[in-house]
From Swiss-Prot:
Keywords: ANK repeat, Host-virus interaction, Inhibition of host NF-kappa-B by virus, Repeat. InterPro entries: Ankyrin_rpt, Ankyrin_rpt-contain_sf. Suppresses the host immune response through NF-kappa-B inactivation. Possesses ankyrin repeat domains required for NF-kappa-B binding but lacks the regulatory regions required for dissociation from NF-kappa-B and degradation. Therefore, prevents host NF-kappa-B release and subsequent activation. PANTHER family: ANKYRIN REPEAT AND PROTEIN KINASE DOMAIN-CONTAINING PROTEIN, ANKYRIN REPEAT-CONTAINING PROTEIN-RELATED. The keyword Repeat applies. GO terms for biological process: symbiont-mediated suppression of host NF-kappaB cascade. Belongs to the polydnaviridae I-Kappa-B-like protein family. SMART domains: ANK. ANK repeats lie at residues 57-89, 94-124, 128-157. This is I-Kappa-B like protein F1.
Length: 164
């Protein structure tokens, strides 16, 4: 049985939402409960366009979950994966993956979970040619760097640039 960790609690304050984003699905991804997400996913059926649609920030639903609901990100993303979401999807504007977002937000649980998934690109670079490891390095997040190294994330580019 899944147990919800808590509310989104992102401390970001109010955000402006496009009219096309004022739908139940994206609200649930952003701040809804795990149970709400479980209730709506069976209604996707053969039409999974919401899973792959980008919002005005260039984010798909999995990116929205990772940025806005750190406490429940892993459980929500697992539910979305069962519905057919692409775990390797990148944000349009930044090219960030879930691992980049986890490194940027200090979400160790999400980073650890992501690194254990099959078929993920642990060395993906975003549009600024930054890896998740490099983001952790820039933020001086030694705990994230250690976690990523433990999962075999390559940090050779950082080392060769004298940044380790």
């Amino acid at each position: 049985m899944m147990e919800e960790v808590g509310t989104a609690g992102n401390n970001l304050g109010a955000t402006e939402i496009d009219h096309d984003e004022q739908n139940t699905f994206l609200r649930i991804c952003r701040t809804g409960s795990i149970y709400e997400l479980m209730e709506v996913t069976p209604f996707f059926g053969g039409d999974r366009h919401l899973l792959h649609r980008y919002d005005r920030h260039g984010r798909q639903c999995i990116h929205t979950v990772a940025w806005h609901d750190r406490a429940n990100a892993v459980m929500k993303i697992e539910i979305l994966m069962q519905s057919g979401v692409n775990i390797n999807a990148k944000e349009l504007g930044t090219g960030n993956t879930l691992l980049h977002i986890a490194a940027s937000t200090g979400n160790y649980l999400l980073a650890d979970w992501f690194c254990q998934q099959l078929g993920v690109d642990l060395g993906a670079s975003n549009n600024q040619q930054e890896t998740a490891y490099y983001i952790a390095y820039k933020m001086r997040d030694r705990k994230m760097m250690k976690l990523l190294r433990a999962h075999g994330v390559a940090y050779n580019n950082t080392l060769s640039a004298g940044l380790l």
